[in-house]
Amino acid sequence: MATPMIAGAAVAAAAVAGRYGILAWQAFKARPRVPRMRRFYEGGFQSSMTRREAALILGVRESVVADKVKEAHRRVMVANHPDAGGSHYLASKINEAKDMMLGKSNNSGSAF
């Protein structure tokens, strides 16, 4: 006598769970698309800075104009300035990247 009641309750619970599962899936598929976070370069620094590495550090393309390089340099330096708790090493690499992109430096002038 109790077995049919337990079986009925189990079927009802499965039906309710299935219904809410389907509703949750439909809500998930209908959600607005949120842009994903931008992926950053995960590698380390090269022994001699190249134009490609400088562009990766500043977050610009290799064929960018000088104004965009200066804007990117300012944005990255604000986030990594030593006076705001950033690293002196990173600040020197950011400055070196700006010089490389602007054509002021051919070889690595970094002390690190």
From Swiss-Prot:
Component of the PAM complex, a complex required for the translocation of transit peptide-containing proteins from the inner membrane into the mitochondrial matrix in an ATP-dependent manner. Probable component of the PAM complex at least composed of a mitochondrial HSP70 protein, TIMM44 and TIMM14. The complex interacts with the TIMM23 component of the TIM17:23 complex. Residues 53-112 form the J domain. GO terms for cellular component: mitochondrial inner membrane. The chain crosses the membrane at residues 6-28. The keyword Transport does not apply. It is a single-pass membrane protein. Keywords: Acetylation, Membrane, Mitochondrion, Mitochondrion inner membrane, Transmembrane, Transmembrane helix. The gene is TIM14-3. It comes from the Eukaryota. The keyword Magnesium does not apply. This is Mitochondrial import inner membrane translocase subunit TIM14-3. InterPro entries: J_dom_sf. It is found in: Mitochondrion; Mitochondrion inner membrane. The modification N-acetylalanine is found at residue 2. Belongs to the TIM14 family. Its main location: mitochondrion.
